[in-house]
Each structure stands twice: as structure tokens, then as C-alpha cells.
């Protein structure tokens, strides 16, 4: 009888990937990035361990949404004070802090526990094409072609 091999954290190889978000559909991009962060693209995937890779997302300011979501989709945050609710549309938040849109979409697709917080730390999002992670030699990650919006 074969035994199931559980990889130890010392044996897990961590790679760095760079993903270009230009003209990509937000949800489809977030799904693939969350899968790589979890390590589901590896044969050594284990649900309760961090076996995933680091992901650098560039051009977050050029991500797209379909339909009327640019004006209808709302992002809410609360300061914790009475009357402290702030509401902002997708278009307004994309003008102000485009990284937050991609981060929030990906974070919602990760586990909502300590493991999810640990996985989220391996995500780096930048609004331009430049990033400071050249020393890690990130490999370009090819997204599914159906994720792009023409």
C-alpha cells in the first residue's frame, strides 16, 4: 500500500512569477493568481500547507471589468467610527489606488484564516510596468487567453 507523501515546508520550491494585468478581466485574473499563490498548479499541493509561489502583478491600473461594473461596482470600507462608512466606485478607486482593486479580488479568493493571510503576503501588486523584484528573477506567467478583454 502506498503512503501519501506530505511535503515539508523545507522541501517546497518557491518560484517567482510576474503576471501582466493589462487588458485582463479582473475576476479571471484573480482566480488564476489565487490558484498559483495556493500552489494548486503543483503536484505537491497540500490544502493545509503553504506550498504556493510568489506572484508579482504589474499594470494593475489597466485591469478591465465587463458590463457596467466600472460605474456600478462599489468598494466599501469603514473607519470604525460612527458614520465612518466610505463608498467608492470601481472607476474612482482605479483612479486613486488601482492596486487595491486587484489585491481585494485576490484576497477574497484565498482562505479566510491564518493560512490565507500568509498566502496573501506572497502577492505583490504594482500599478505600472516596473517592479523592484528583478533580483528574484521572476518568470512570466501565461494566463488563460480567454481572460483578456479586447
Curated annotation (Swiss-Prot):
Region (Disordered): which ranges? 130-150
Does Cytoplasm appear among the keywords? Answer: no
Enumerate composition-biased segments (Polar residues).
136-150
Q: Name one GO molecular function term.
A: structural constituent of ribosome
- What is the similarity comment for this entry? Belongs to the universal ribosomal protein uL13 family.
- UniProt key word Flavoprotein: no
Q: What does this protein do?
A: This protein is one of the early assembly proteins of the 50S ribosomal subunit, although it is not seen to bind rRNA by itself. It is important during the early stages of 50S assembly.
Which SUPFAM superfamilies did the record assign?
Ribosomal protein L13
List the source organism: Synechococcus sp. (strain RCC307)
**What are the entry keywords?**
Ribonucleoprotein, Ribosomal protein
Listed GO CC annotations: cytosolic large ribosomal subunit
In the record, biological process GO terms are:
negative regulation of translation; translation
Gene name, please? Answer: rplM
Q: What is this protein called?
A: Large ribosomal subunit protein uL13
Q: Which InterPro entries match?
A: Ribosomal_uL13, Ribosomal_uL13_bac-type, Ribosomal_uL13_CS, Ribosomal_uL13_sf
Q: How does it assemble?
A: Part of the 50S ribosomal subunit.
- PANTHER family assigned to the protein according to its UniProt record, in alphabetical order: LARGE RIBOSOMAL SUBUNIT PROTEIN UL13M, RIBOSOMAL PROTEIN L13
Amino acid at each position: 500500500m502506498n503512503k501519501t507523501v506530505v511535503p515539508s515546508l523545507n522541501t517546497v520550491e518557491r518560484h517567482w512569477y510576474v503576471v501582466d494585468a493589462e487588458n485582463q478581466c479582473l475576476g479571471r485574473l484573480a482566480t488564476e493568481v489565487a490558484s498559483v499563490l495556493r500552489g494548486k498548479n503543483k503536484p505537491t499541493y497540500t490544502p493545509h500547507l503553504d506550498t504556493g509561489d510568489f506572484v508579482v502583478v504589474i499594470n494593475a491600473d489597466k485591469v478591465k471589468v465587463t458590463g457596467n461594473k466600472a460605474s456600478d461596482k462599489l468598494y466599501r470600507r469603514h473607519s470604525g467610527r460612527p458614520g465612518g462608512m466610505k463608498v467608492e466606485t470601481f472607476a474612482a478607486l482605479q483612479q486613486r489606488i488601482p492596486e487595491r482593486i486587484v489585491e481585494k479580488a485576490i484576497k477574497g479568493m484565498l482562505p479566510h484564516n491564518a493560512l490565507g493571510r500568509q498566502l496573501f503576503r506572497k502577492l505583490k501588486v504594482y500599478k505600472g510596468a516596473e517592479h523592484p523584484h528583478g533580483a528574484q528573477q521572476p518568470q512570466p506567467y501565461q494566463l488563460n487567453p480567454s481572460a483578456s478583454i479586447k
